[in-house]
């Protein structure tokens, strides 16, 4: 019995062992299957659509499957085929560095590998900072190609491949030198599966552990439902907020049929993905045909559902469609870039990664929204508000969620929150714990946002964890995209949101508005209006419209009607327009009365703010906007013998092609703008129906509606660029006038020459087609935007016969220092093109015979893209195309600043398309030369063949030079012996900041525009040269007054000319520094028929301590015709100045503007309004003056003006 019992126990033990082994094997198989499915889903979301599923790395049985796939993470770069990961290290933040390049994963060599390089990897992967940068294949040897070697990161790059390196696949390494990284976010045990992984399995509870980095959730474009296998994404649309709609269902991504698909359905998608609202709901496979199952059909959303699959539909996998009917969405937050970004990019940001789809727990999205900053431990959300776009503001900081105090909390702060979370704009900024009291730390207090910041924590505040608040003061936000489920609409709602009700001006009964209060406008053109327009707008309105159009375009803004409560300084109800340029926003104007002015942005963004106070109400305003390309030019072509000049078919240049204008709505006012823009006088006729023949290019504009006062054709209202319903049989034309013909030169004063800075235009000899004067010496300087070239065309040349008497000279740059391209004489014609962005035309006549003269037009076109040079205030930026270098046999790494190869400051930024050097004027070997009031900064770039006995390719030398106040050669290439030399010289600008001040103390700048003043009031001006070079000085050469903003020759009054004071009230003040000048004069106006006065001041830039410079010579008397070149002057136009009038109907706060100094003291301080002006750049700043009588200045030849 004892032996039997022992045998029985042994058998039972063997049975248990076998059972355990079997169970373990089955579990491992299940785990492997699950891992394979997860990897497949990962790769499916990380590859561009053109790659078939069979080609996806995650679907192959490759060696990567044995290298702990659970702990591998990838971060993508800007190129579609670049990604980064750490493998074989035990968790996602340590391991061997691998890069996905051209479809294959490869390693990085450890030559020069250090913690600077490792820091870039850790930051890119959202893994904190580098703890260690081990080499020698510390995490095992890789199997793919060795992609990068000799990396020399500074530690601040966004992507590892942005660091200087020896070139892709250029190395001298083996896999035994594979580089690795250990980041601060690495797990400290490789045997434990990290907590965040548990949310990816079906059997585990979906809890977010503290180990999930802050950036994980807000950057994904998938939105999960309560079922583990449901998620949403947009693919193949170029960015994360537009594309084909795809749903993850039962482990596979599928499409949605476009039957009944409309903006209500699309709105649900955009809201669910945090992409704003629906701009469009395209069907018919607009973003390409999908390849998976068609999951949903006949969707009938109301637009308020939380998830797309919550809408009524025909059932999962029930449809009668094909993939040619796949539905798409374009959301308001979609990028406006034409660059195609692969599908996998949509789930991440450039500096972080989030490869998660179904792993996000369902409860995360419906009630909270997070938005991550670049720091791994910062995020933002709204909680306890009923949906993702309203609630208590909470910030994730150092691993814990905390609240924000409501001290100084307002809609500017709330706007930043709403924009950061993709929730539209701020409807309200409630405090006092409106959404309940939080329980975590109070992280921020005294926030003072401008409303334009990208992140809430970028706003000025009192410091992290620094406050004097309790949780009863927790701040909240209600955004425009918040659900309208609340049963009680608060009173403040009616004046601040595009809701269903609105305050009526005389009763508490709400009236329906005709337009919302603020919003984001992303169309190429559009309209908007004040709340309830044309009804009365509400009191205490604060509306902000943010307009953003395609990159490379600018914005025009005009007003159809404007009726606000009027005040001379617009302090009650007003509209303010801001020019949103990179890194700053500048006020273009503050208005409260109707104006025909067109406001134009410098870049592709503009902000319009409307504010009303607590009393008087008016109908408000109706505004329109459109956009136009920055490189637009204008010309007339195909004129006939009846109209030899200033007539023809209207054509516009944009994007490398000339296109026509449709004649729909084309009239004399439109033609007037064309004639003025080209310097062709007034419009005589505006023929349509292809009067000058049909064009062959694109039809660029249609439905043009000019008022006749615009400065360019594209400032006029139109249908949008390349949007039309026309054919070339409807091409528009113009016939312009010319001044009256005279046979003898007039005995009156004349002006010739000047500075032309438009992209295209025209000019002519004095009195053309009347006879030009004797002894003329006229110089026209033409400067267009950087890296463009100028082409001038002479259409009619009637000069004295023989080139030794009267002639025209064309210079490739400023005429005193540049090569002569041609001398044009009687009867000649043709066109000439500069090698840079600057050209000078000089016209000379002798003492005898005169004739009709000439007229010419010019236009600009882009120069070669192989090399570019930009001259900025404190450094130059030289860019060279990598394809150009490759064509010469060099790689991007071969190009250096000789002698400065190892200085970090002097190393280039290398991308796949160009090599860019940022070269300071004060270092990296830059040479400064001062000559004749001109400062030239020069340096060189070199790519040389390695030393050896023989060589088979030329050395490359590139000379770069910025001549401040002089000219440029760009992309002039010539061969010299065995060296290929490229000389780049760029014409640069000095910037001058000029402002009006309220008194001689120069403490308070004047902000209002126009600037209303009393007759004979002292006007104080300060101009400052903005440049880092302390050896420069500024001098006021000439200031001329005119009643016209663009004409300073017909009727003028001199304040100071050539340094000689002409007006007895002009007075200069001592200079606080050589770069600042101050002066004053008394206000006046030109007779009673001219209500405004404009000033044109010419500022001269000199060497500060040069006794022979122009700044030291003071008053200089010189001949009128000795115009020389304007290259040392900065021209600034100021105006209009208008007489201050009192408004009797205004409240008792109005007082006569007797002493602006006292007003300044009472108000504390004024905001500054300064306008920067480059060389020859005409900048309009509002100022003002008026008249009641007149006074003659006949002795000086000055026009009649009034000062008493």
Swiss-Prot record:
Q: Which residues cross the membrane?
A: 1168-1188
Provide the SRCR domain boundaries.
84-184, 232-332, 380-480, 634-737
Concerning InterPro entries, the annotation shows:
CUB_dom, Sperma_CUB_dom_sf, SRCR, SRCR-like_dom_sf, ZP-C, ZP-C_dom, ZP-N, ZP_dom
Glycosylated residues, chain numbering: 585, 593, 640, 749, 932, 977, 993, 1029
CDD domains found in the cross-reference section = CUB (cd00041)
Instruction: State the GO CC annotations.
Output: extracellular matrix; extracellular region; plasma membrane; transport vesicle membrane; zymogen granule membrane
Domain (CUB) spans 517-628, 752-861
Question: What does the PTM comment state?
Answer: Highly N- and O-glycosylated. The O-glycans are heavily sulfated.
UniProt signal peptide: 1-19
| Single GO MF annotation | zymogen binding
Keywords linked to the UniProt accession? Cytoplasmic vesicle, Developmental protein, Differentiation, Disulfide bond, Glycoprotein, Membrane, Protein transport, Repeat, Secreted, Signal, Transmembrane, Transmembrane helix, Transport
Q: Which Pfam families match?
A: CUB, SRCR, Zona_pellucida, ZP-N
How does this chain sit within the bilayer?
Single-pass membrane protein
Single GO biological process annotation from the record: protein transport
Q: Enumerate the subcellular locations listed in this protein's record, separating them with semicolons.
A: Secreted; Cytoplasmic vesicle, Secretory vesicle membrane
Q: How does it assemble?
A: Interacts with LGALS3. Binds SFTPD and SPAR in a calcium-dependent manner.
- Give the protein's function: May play roles in mucosal defense system and cellular immune defense. May play a role in liver regeneration. May be an important factor in fate decision and differentiation of transit-amplifying ductular (oval) cells within the hepatic lineage. May function as a binding protein in saliva for the regulation of taste sensation. May play a role as an opsonin receptor for SFTPD and SPAR in macrophage tissues throughout the body, including epithelial cells lining the gastrointestinal tract. Required for terminal differentiation of columnar epithelial cells during early embryogenesis.
Which family does the UniProt entry place this protein in? Belongs to the DMBT1 family.
Free-text comment about domains:
The SRCR domains mediate binding to bacteria.
Protein name in the entry: Scavenger receptor cysteine-rich domain-containing protein DMBT1
Q: Which organism is it from?
A: Sus scrofa
């Amino acid at each position: 019995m004892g032996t039997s019992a022992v045998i029985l126990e042994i058998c039972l033990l063997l049975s248990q062992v076998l059972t355990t082994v079997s169970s373990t094997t089955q579990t491992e198989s299940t785990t492997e299957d699950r891992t394979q499915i997860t990897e497949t889903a990962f790769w499916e979301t990380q590859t561009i659509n053109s790659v078939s599923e069979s080609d996806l790395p995650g679907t192959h049985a490759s060696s990567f499957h044995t290298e702990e796939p659970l702990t591998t993470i990838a971060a993508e770069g800007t190129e579609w085929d670049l990604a980064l990961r750490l493998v074989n290290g035990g968790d996602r933040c340590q391991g061997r560095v691998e890069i996905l390049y051209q479809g294959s994963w490869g390693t990085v060599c450890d030559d020069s590998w250090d913690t600077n390089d490792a820091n870039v990897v850790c930051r890119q992967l959202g893994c904190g900072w580098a703890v260690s940068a081990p080499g020698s294949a510390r995490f095992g040897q890789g199997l793919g190609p060795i992609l990068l070697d000799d990396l020399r990161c500074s530690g601040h790059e966004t992507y590892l491949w942005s660091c200087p390196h020896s070139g892709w696949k250029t190395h001298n390494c083996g896999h035994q030198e594979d580089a690795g990284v250990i980041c601060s976010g690495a797990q400290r045990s490789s045997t434990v599966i990290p907590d965040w992984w548990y949310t990816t399995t079906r059997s585990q509870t979906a809890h977010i552990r503290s180990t999930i980095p802050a950036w994980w959730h807000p950057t994904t474009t998938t939105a999960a439902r309560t079922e583990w296998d449901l998620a949403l994404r947009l693919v193949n649309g170029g960015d994360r907020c537009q594309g084909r709609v795809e749903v993850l269902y039962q482990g596979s991504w599928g499409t949605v049929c476009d039957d009944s698909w409309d903006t209500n359905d699309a709105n649900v998608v955009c809201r669910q993905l945090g992409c704003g609202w629906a701009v469009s709901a395209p069907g018919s496979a607009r973003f390409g045909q999908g390849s998976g199952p068609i999951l949903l059909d006949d969707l009938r959303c109301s637009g308020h559902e939380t998830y797309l699959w919550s809408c009524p539909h025909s059932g999962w996998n029930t449809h009668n469609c094909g993939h040619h009917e796949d539905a798409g969405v374009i959301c308001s937050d979609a990028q406006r870039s034409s660059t195609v970004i692969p599908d996998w990019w949509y789930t991440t940001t450039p500096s972080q990664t989030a490869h998660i789809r179904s792993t996000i727990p369902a409860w995360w999205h419906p009630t909270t929204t997070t938005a991550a900053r670049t720091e791994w431990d910062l995020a933002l959300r709204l909680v306890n508000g009923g949906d993702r776009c309203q609630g208590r503001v909470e910030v994730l900081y150092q691993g814990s969620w905390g609240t924000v105090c409501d001290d100084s909390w307002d809609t500017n702060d709330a706007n930043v929150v709403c924009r950061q979370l993709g929730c539209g704009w701020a409807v309200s900024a409630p405090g006092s714990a409106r959404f309940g009291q939080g329980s975590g730390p109070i992280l921020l207090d005294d926030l003072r946002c401008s409303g334009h910041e990208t992140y809430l924590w970028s706003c000025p505040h009192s410091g992290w964890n620094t406050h004097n608040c309790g949780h009863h003061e927790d701040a909240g936000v209600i955004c425009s995209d918040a659900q309208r489920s609340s049963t009680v609409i608060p009173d403040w709602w009616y004046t601040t949101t595009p809701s269903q009700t609105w305050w009526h001006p005389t009763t508490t009964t709400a009236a329906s508005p005709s337009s919302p209060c603020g919003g984001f406008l992303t169309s190429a053109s559009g309209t908007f209006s004040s709340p309830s327009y044309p009804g009365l707008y509400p009191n205490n309105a604060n509306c902000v419209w943010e307009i953003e159009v395609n990159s490379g375009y600018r914005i025009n803004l005009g007003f159809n009607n404007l009726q606000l409560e009027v005040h001379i300084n617009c302090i009650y109800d007003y509209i303010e327009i801001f020019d949103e340029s990179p890194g700053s926003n500048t006020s273009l104007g503050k208005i409260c009365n109707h104006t025909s002015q067109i406001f134009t942005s410098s870049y592709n963004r503009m902000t319009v703010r409307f504010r009303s106070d607590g009393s008087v109400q008016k109908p408000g305003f109706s505004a329109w906007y459109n956009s136009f390309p920055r490189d637009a030019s204008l010309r007339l072509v195909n004129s006939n013998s009846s109209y030899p000049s200033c007539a023809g078919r209207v054509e516009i240049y944009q994007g490398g092609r000339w296109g026509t204008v449709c004649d729909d709505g084309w009239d004399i006012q439109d033609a007037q703008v064309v004639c003025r823009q080209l310097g062709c006088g007034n419009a005589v006729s505006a023929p349509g129906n292809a009067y000058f023949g049909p064009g062959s290019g694109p039809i660029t504009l249609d439905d043009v509606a000019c008022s006749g006062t615009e400065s360019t054709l594209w400032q006029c209202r139109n249908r949008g660029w390349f949007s039309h319903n026309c054919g070339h049989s409807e091409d528009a034309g113009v016939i312009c006038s010319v001044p009256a013909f005279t046979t003898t030169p007039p005995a009156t004063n004349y002006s010739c020459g000047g500075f032309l800075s438009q992209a295209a235009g025209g000019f002519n000899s004095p009195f053309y087609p009347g006879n030009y004067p004797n002894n003329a010496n006229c110089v026209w300087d033409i400067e267009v935007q950087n890296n463009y070239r100028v082409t001038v065309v002479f259409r009619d040349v009637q000069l004295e016969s023989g080139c030794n008497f009267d002639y025209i000279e064309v210079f490739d740059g400023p005429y005193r220092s540049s090569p002569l391209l041609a001398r044009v004489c009687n009867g000649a014609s043709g066109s000439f093109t500069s090698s840079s962005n600057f050209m000078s035309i000089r016209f000379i006549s002798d003492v005898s015979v005169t004739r009709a003269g000439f007229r010419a037009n010019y236009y600009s076109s882009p120069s070669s893209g192989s090399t570019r040079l930009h001259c900025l205030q404190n450094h130059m930026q030289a860019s060279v195309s990598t394809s150009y270098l490759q064509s010469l046999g060099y790689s991007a790494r071969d190009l250096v600043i000789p002698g400065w190869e190892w200085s970090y400051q002097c190393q280039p930024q290398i991308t796949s398309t160009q090599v860019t050097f940022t070269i300071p004027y004060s270092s990296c070997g830059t040479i400064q030369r001062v000559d004749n009031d001109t400062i030239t900064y020069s340096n060189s770039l070199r790519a040389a063949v390695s030393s050896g006995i023989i060589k088979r390719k030329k050395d490359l030398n590139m000379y770069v030079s910025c001549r401040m106040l002089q000219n440029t050669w760009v992309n002039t290439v010539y061969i010299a012996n065995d060296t290929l030399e490229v000389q780049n010289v760029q014409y640069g600008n000095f910037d001058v900041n000029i402002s009006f001040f309220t008194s001689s103390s120069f403490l308070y700048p004047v902000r209002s525009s126009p600037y209303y003043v009393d007759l004979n009031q002292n006007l104080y001006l300060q101009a400052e040269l903005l440049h880092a070079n302390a050896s420069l000085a500024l001098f006021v050469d000439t200031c001329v007054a005119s009643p016209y903003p663009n004409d300073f020759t017909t009727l003028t009054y001199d304040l100071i000319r050539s340094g000689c004071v002409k007006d007895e009230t002009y007075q200069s003040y001592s200079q606080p520094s050589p770069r600042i000048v101050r002066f004053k004069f008394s206000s006046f106006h030109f007779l009673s028929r001219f209500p405004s006065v404009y000033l044109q001041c010419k500022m001269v830039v000199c060497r500060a301590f040069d006794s022979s410079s122009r700044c030291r010579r003071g008053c200089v008397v010189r001949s009128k015709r000795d115009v020389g070149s304007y290259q040392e002057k900065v021209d600034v136009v100021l105006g209009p100045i208008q007489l201050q009038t009192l408004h009797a109907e205004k409240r008792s706060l109005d007082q006569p503007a007797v002493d602006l100094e006292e007003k300044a003291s009472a108000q504390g301080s004024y905001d500054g309004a300064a306008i920067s002006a480059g060389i020859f750049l005409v900048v309009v700043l509002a100022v003002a003056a008026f008249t009641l009588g007149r006074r003659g200045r006949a002795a000086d030849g000055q026009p009649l003006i009034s000062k008493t």
